[in-house]
From Swiss-Prot:
PTM info: Contains 7 disulfide bonds.
Catalytic activity of the protein: a 1,2-diacyl-sn-glycero-3-phosphocholine + H2O = a 1-acyl-sn-glycero-3-phosphocholine + a fatty acid + H(+)
Provenance organism: Daboia russelii (Russel's viper)
Subcellular location: Secreted
Name of the protein: Neutral phospholipase A2 RVV-PFIIc'
Predominant location: secreted
Job of this protein: Snake venom phospholipase A2 (PLA2) that shows enzymatic, indirect hemolytic and anticoagulant activities. Interestingly, anti-PFIIc'serum completely inhibits anticoagulant activity, partially inhibits the indirect hemolytic activity, but does not inhibit enzymatic activity. PLA2 catalyzes the calcium-dependent hydrolysis of the 2-acyl groups in 3-sn-phosphoglycerides.
EC number: 3.1.1.4
Cellular-component GO terms for this entry: extracellular region
GO biological-process terms attached to the record: killing of cells of another organism; lipid catabolic process
Length: 19
């Protein structure tokens, strides 16, 4: 699903943002 893909991106970007 497109939403799942977007959610994965958010998680990845979130990890990047944490650091």
């Amino acid at each position: 699903n497109l939403f799942q893909f977007a959610e994965m991106i958010v998680k990845m970007t979130g990890k990047e943002a944490v650091h």
